């Protein structure tokens, strides 16, 4: 099972709404918001955590005050429940993936880059595949590979401790395959076409994932959820 949730980042969130939503996340996260130079970075960080909290509250029936985020030795967040999650954001979109197996997700806005950097950072087999693409699709293909590689690294949970060229993506088969030390990795890769101008990939460290659910949310829905939760707490006689 993989549940994907995504929300569009508004150009502006009313200050009172932002403060209310912020009150539903950890003090550590709240303190981090004031350090952001770009307010939209704070929006992205807030919305990412709220997506996870929404799932835990509504699906697992966990009270918001009982949700505590921790980090492993490599900095990947986790919770003390039988669930795995990962968050990514790029420009105007925030996405998260939730699963009963380790999972990673990455979204990137397609932007102009020098394709030659792929030769430096990618595995040689990936660079050969990239060079085989039509010139007008190479940039899009670059971000296709990049998001798959990022989602795999994030699923493992070791961040950049895993060299990005220590494994390679085989796009020449009916399904996307990852090889590490010439051995096929037991993973499942999804590449949902969510939004024009973006690439998104999701990786599960389980080879037989068959159930994928994708849900688009509005900021107002998150507001309503936490308003309802607050009202219930204040009227719990």
From Swiss-Prot:
Does the keyword section mention Signal? Answer: no
Q: Which residues bind Mg(2+)?
A: 106, 108, 150
The enzyme's E.C. designation: 2.7.8.-
Give the catalytic activity.
Answer: apo-[peptidyl-carrier protein] + CoA = holo-[peptidyl-carrier protein] + adenosine 3',5'-bisphosphate + H(+)
The Swiss-Prot or TrEMBL record lists the needed cofactor(s) as: Mg(2+)
Q: Which UniProt keywords apply?
A: Antibiotic biosynthesis, Magnesium, Metal-binding, Transferase
Q: Which GO terms describe its cellular component?
A: cytosol
Q: Which InterPro entries match?
A: 4-PPantetheinyl_Trfase_dom, 4-PPantetheinyl_Trfase_dom_sf, AASDHPPT_N, P-Pant_transferase_sf, Ppantetheine-prot_Trfase_dom
List GO molecular-function terms, semicolon-separated: holo-[acyl-carrier-protein] synthase activity; magnesium ion binding
Question: What function does this protein fulfil?
Answer: Activates the five peptidyl carrier protein (PCP) domains of gramicidin synthase GrsAB, by transferring the 4'-phosphopantetheinyl moiety of coenzyme A (CoA) to a serine residue. Required for gramicidin S production.
Protein name according to UniProt: 4'-phosphopantetheinyl transferase gsp
- Origin species: Aneurinibacillus migulanus
